Swiss-Prot record:
Basic and acidic residues bias: start-end ranges: 582-600, 692-702
Renumbered residue ranges of the record's region Disordered: 459-522, 539-627, 649-668, 692-835, 856-879
Organism: Homo sapiens
Protein name per its UniProtKB record: Uncharacterized protein C2orf78
Biased composition (Polar residues): 755-779, 790-824
InterPro entries according to UniProt: C2orf78-like (IPR040292), DUF4629 (IPR027898)
Composition bias type Low complexity, residue spans: 651-660
Domain of life the protein comes from: Eukaryota
Listed Basic residues bias regions: 546-567
Higher taxonomy: Eukaryota, Metazoa, Chordata, Craniata, Vertebrata
Keywords annotated in UniProt: Coiled coil
Coiled coil ranges: 872-899
């Protein structure tokens, strides 16, 4: 399982090494740090330092987790180095993956040029930390770590990262869940601490961690022991859980056309098989191969990492790298392009396989490596998954071995790929959205999708953006230009900007499709990429999907937004009106909205259509059969204007009365056939009914113009029931036990809508009576208007009449009057102030003084109701037609009430309440 492959100078690529497959690594995350090295004036130096960190299972017992970056969830993590051209993911022995791409590290967030001394090279800046934490961890936690990169030029980049790890109960492994990185790259001069190598050494310290520096430059090729170059110990606090163990091995080999020693014979890593009370990081330097290893040291146990000869070999093939020893079938041929500066080869995981070559080339290597890797300083927070602050002084050999990734001037697909990859890393959207910046990134994208890395990159992106957004943009632009040929790299750029913006927008509350529309600046690119901008994050995915839909279906989005916005705060009924009004407004804005408005207005129009004929009914007519029955029992007005005997008139009153009442309630369009006729003086119709009521009430000076009209000679005269006070009857609406209830309920049910339409009508019809009363009264509204007028007028105009005539007019008028008055209490206060004094107008049915209210129908002394003469034969067809019409209107009204569809259960409940209160039996 040990694979270490290193290419020659020409094929400078680092092969992932799988150290001791026993390591349990669920997945690896890669973060890249990017910052500009401003130390050299006139040159934008972006250096990337790669620090693979792998956390072992809770116990690194005799095994070191290997480094692998796999497109699939990596069992091991791999140290990846850029190759001159071509990118390939191939699993090594199924546990390690070899990744090579041109001019950039696999997941380098950005590529930059680093000119140090006289050599221009870029460090592959990759942080890889294994998501697997010690199995003992019990709870998810946020981990903060600081990464400090210090180069010889004293350019300092510090970032603070926070990663959240979620512990799965089954696997007992800590899995990083969308680690978020909040960091700011700070460039500053670091106090130079010269070490024996003459490099600047910065020792970032973190409580609870130990950092050990080992300089093995003095050691022979056989690193049997580690010489302590220097150690700074920070006592760690006891942790109930194991610290995720991490091992970093940096090995740099500078071959000269010969196979360089891959590594020394052995490396010792101290790890704890027990909960790590103290976490220590050892950085070992060796001039031999710049072999640097980082290991967690816990007081409990150390184990030696055996290195097998077959573990690694280096090859001098320029364009391809072949694993000569134990090549895995998956490995196949890995295309590796020569690095421009093939002097040094950086490899991870030492393997002593070529002792001979090492010995032979040891002098050469030492000579070439005049400056060994000074220090990799890693700070490990206790219990922190391998999120490490890293300090790397200038490493010329490493720079030499690494192909300058950041050189934008370098033309060719290498730079294109590099920029694409950097863009892909840069672009949060790319990882998060699973966008493949290029064919080279296909595997990367898959890998990223598999891992939880995207948020980190997004945060890194954010870090990078503040640092040098312009440089990145330039890179993005140039890379995109270079890569336009490749994999629609233009999409990448658009995504980089769009994704960021979209991501931010997505993260922002999606205020609706309009934003979503705005978000996808390049919807074509998004579609081409088959990448949903929001797919990066769950929340973002929804927003992005909305954005896509909005962009793809702006019309739908607009209509949906319209309907949604309309419907949100509105009830269906009010919402319908408001929606219709909004629609009318929005219809001006958009035809789609107009369509929506039309849809919504259609039901309204239907209502109106019904209303012109039936809508009044709908508003005023009782919405339940009980209410209708009560209305019938009380209102016995013939549609032709004659009052029919209570019993005989029930059906007609039901049809006529309810229809007329409804019509009165209904806005004039509904009333036009009836109300207009009535207002115009058609005695036989509702107005006649009103006149009939007004026979008593008209005598009482009906103020309403229509009511003021006296009923034609055949009309029934309404005799108002005697009430203790006008206030009481109106307050009670009780005089007609069925009708007041029904009327009240309809009035209450309908008053809101009728108020607007019927209020005008009722006002026009009954100026004395408030419109809301008519509106509110469903069935009795029409009679109620005259009645209210009667009651008001009689009280004012004919104080003597109101009681007796009303009692005479009795039940229809009284019922309507009571219902109207109850309704009027709320709306009618203007019309009848005294009547409105009634308590609790909000109580539709329950009137406090109802029990005190005389019930004339129970009194034998009630004046005989005026009997209407039978209609003539000539009037019979008209009456039948009116009855049919009223029935039809009632049916329609039953379908559509002022609040919309009839809520039968609610109406039934109200009917039951009314009946129970008044002693009715339903």
């Amino acid at each position: 399982m040990h694979w270490l492959a290193s290419a020659t100078q020409t094929s400078a690529s680092i092969v992932s090494s799988s150290l001791l497959s026993a390591v349990d690594v669920s997945s690896s995350l890669t973060m890249s740090e990017y910052f500009q090295n401003t130390s050299l004036p006139g040159t934008a130096n972006s250096r990337q330092f790669s620090l693979p960190v792998v956390s072992n299972a809770a116990f690194l017992t005799g095994s070191i987790s290997n480094f692998s970056r796999a497109s699939a969830p990596a069992i091991s993590s791999a140290w990846l180095q850029p190759s001159a051209s071509g990118t390939s993911f191939q699993p090594l022995m199924g546990s390690a993956y070899l990744y090579q791409h041109s001019s950039t590290t696999m997941l380098s967030g950005v590529t930059g040029q680093s000119h140090i001394c006289t050599s221009a090279a870029s460090y592959p800046g990759v942080f890889e930390w294994d998501s697997t934490a010690s199995t003992v961890k019990k709870s998810s936690s946020l981990r903060d770590f600081t990464v400090t990169v210090i180069d010889q030029n004293t350019a300092v980049s510090s970032m603070s990262m926070t990663a959240q790890y979620y512990k799965t109960s089954d696997t007992n492994t800590m899995v990083p869940l969308y680690p978020s990185l909040s960091a700011s790259l700070v460039q500053g001069t670091l106090t130079q601490i010269p070490n024996q190598q003459g490099h600047n050494l910065s020792l970032p310290c973190q409580i609870g961690s130990q950092v050990y520096y080992y300089n093995q430059g003095t050691l022979g090729p056989q690193l049997s022991c580690l010489q302590s170059y220097g150690s700074v110990s920070y006592t760690g606090y006891r942790a109930s859980a194991h610290q995720p163990e991490m091992v970093m091995v940096l090995k740099e080999v500078q071959p000269t056309n010969v196979l360089p020693p891959v590594s020394t014979s052995g490396m010792y890593y101290s790890v704890s098989s027990q909960p790590i009370t103290e976490t220590s990081v050892q950085v070992m330097e060796t001039s031999l191969g710049m072999d640097t290893s980082l290991g967690l040291q816990s007081p409990s146990q150390t184990f030696c990492l055996p290195q097998t000869p077959e573990f690694s070999k280096s090859f001098s093939s320029r364009n391809t790298q072949t694993l000569e020893s134990n090549p895995s079938p998956e490995l196949g041929d890995i295309s590796i392009t020569p690095v421009q500066s093939p002097t040094n080869l950086l490899t991870l995981s030492p393997a002593p396989s070529q002792e001979k070559n090492e010995n032979e080339n040891l002098d050469e290597i030492k000579t070439n490596l005049s400056k060994p890797l000074d220090v990799h300083q890693i700070l490990i927070g206790n219990q922190d998954p391998p999120l490490l602050p890293v300090e790397i002084p200038d490493i010329h050999p490493l720079l030499a071995c690494i192909d300058p990734l950041g050189q934008e001037e370098q033309p060719g697909s290498e730079n294109a790929n590099l920029r694409n990859k950097s863009l892909s890393l840069e672009d949060q959207g790319i990882f998060e959205n699973g966008i493949e910046s290029s064919s080279d990134l296909a595997d990367i994208t898959t890998w990223v999708e598999d891992t939880y890395l995207p948020p980190i990159f997004s945060s890194l992106q954010d870090l990078d953006q503040p640092e040098s957004p312009s440089a990145k943009k330039a890179k993005d632009t140039s890379a995109i230009k270079v890569n336009q040929v490749q994999e629609k790299s233009c999409v990448i750029k658009g995504h980089s900007d769009q994704v960021r913006k979209n991501k931010h927008k997505a993260s922002e509350p999606i205020q609706g499709a309009p934003k979503a529309k705005i978000q996808p600046k390049n919807p074509e690119c998004l579609l081409e990429r088959e990448v949903v901008v929001g797919s990066a994050t769950v929340s973002n995915s929804a927003s992005v999907n909305k954005a896509k839909h909005s962009s793809n279906k702006p019309h739908k989005a607009a209509s949906s937004r319209i309907s949604k916005t309309k419907s949100h705060g509105q009830e269906k009924t009010k919402g319908n009106r408001k929606n219709s009004s909004k629609k009318s407004e929005e219809s001006k804005q958009s035809g789609k909205k107009v369509k929506v408005e039309e849809k919504q207005t259609i039901p309204n129009m239907k209502r109106k259509k019904n209303q012109p004929e039936l809508s009044q009914k709908t508003l005023k007519k009782p919405r339940s059969s009980l209410g209708m029955h009560m209305l019938e029992s009380v209102q016995v007005f013939h549609a032709l204007g004659k009052k029919i005997d209570m019993k005989t008139g029930f059906s007609s009153s039901r049809t006529l009365g309810s229809s007329s009442n409804t019509q009165n309630r209904q806005p004039f369009p509904a009333l036009k056939p009836w109300l207009d006729i009535q207002h115009e003086g058609k005695g036989p119709e509702k107005i006649q009914v009103k006149a009939q009521k007004l026979d008593g009430s008209a005598e009482k000076e009906c103020t309403s113009p229509s009511h003021s009209e006296l009923p034609p000679p055949g009309k029934v005269k309404l005799i108002p029931l005697p009430f203790l006070t006008l206030d009481q009857p109106q307050a009670r609406h009780v005089s007609r036990r069925p009708n007041p209830l029904a009327s009240r309920r309809p009035a209450v049910a309908y008053p809101a809508r009728p108020d607007s339409t019927n209020s005008a009508q009722s006002n026009a019809v009954n100026p004395s009576r408030p419109a809301p009363t008519n509106t509110s009264l469903t069935g009795p509204a029409t009679p109620a208007q005259p009645i209210s007028a009667k009651a008001t007028q009689p009280s004012s105009a004919n104080p003597t009449q109101p009681t007796v005539p009303q009692s005479a007019a009795s039940r229809p008028s009284a019922y309507k009057t009571s219902s109207c008055s109850s309704l009027q209490r709320e709306p009618v206060s203007t019309a009848v102030t005294s009547l409105r004094s009634l308590p609790k107008p909000q109580n539709q049915f329950l009137i406090q003084d109802f029990s005190l209210q005389p019930r004339p129908w129970r009194k034998p002394t009630v004046p005989e109701p005026v009997m209407s003469t039978p209609i003539t034969e000539e009037q019979r067809p008209e009456r039948e037609a009116m009855k049919r019409k009223a029935q039809q209107e009632r049916e329609n009204a039953a379908k559509y009430t002022s609040l919309g569809k009839v809520q039968f259960f609610i109406e039934r409940e109200r009917d039951m309440e009314i009946a129970e209160y008044y002693g009715y039996t339903i």
